[in-house]
Amino acid sequence: MSDEGDVADEAVADGAENADSRGSGGRTALVTKPVVRPQRPTGKRSRSRAAGADADVDVEEPSTAASEATGVAKDDSTTKAVSKAARAKKASKPKARSVNPIAFVYNYLKQVVAEMRKVIWPNRKQMLTYTSVVLAFLAFMVALVAGADLGLTKLVMLVFG
């Protein structure tokens, strides 16, 4: 079974039907149930979060999408007018407003707390493991630097006496 539902099952079972012979022209719709996300992250990356990350994709105007769906082409003049309006909208920058420093700090701290809630914190066993690895690495590096220092000191004393 695939994400495409019964259409894919029928195509596999029949074998003779191809995408061009279907009424939809090879396109199928996928109906999904809304996903209830946990309040706190579980440590697993989900498919819906990756799909939601593409929110900055350009969205077509409804009139353009409707005309393409019905097969009716738009005039060049209306397309040019729409593109000029879009460029004018992008070119006009919002006025710079004065930011209250207290409100800025409050908003910043609110965002920090929100981001800290998203962090997946280690449990006690993981913390002990990470701490012991860091301490072992630190002891190794201290011994390495001390050994290099002692060795180079002896070498300098032998050469320069």
From Swiss-Prot:
It is found in: Cell membrane. It comes from the Bacteria. GO terms for cellular component: peptidoglycan-based cell wall; plasma membrane. Keywords: Cell membrane, Membrane, Protein transport, Translocation, Transmembrane, Transmembrane helix, Transport. InterPro entries: SecE_bac, SecE_sf, Translocase_SecE/Sec61-g. It holds the Pfam family SecE. Its main location: membrane. It is a single-pass membrane protein. Residues 1-80 are annotated as: Disordered. The chain crosses the membrane at residues 133-153. Residues 1-12 have a biased composition (Acidic residues). Component of the Sec protein translocase complex. Heterotrimer consisting of SecY, SecE and SecG subunits. The heterotrimers can form oligomers, although 1 heterotrimer is thought to be able to translocate proteins. Interacts with the ribosome. Interacts with SecDF, and other proteins may be involved. Interacts with SecA. This is Protein translocase subunit SecE. It comes from Mycobacterium tuberculosis (strain ATCC 25618 / H37Rv).
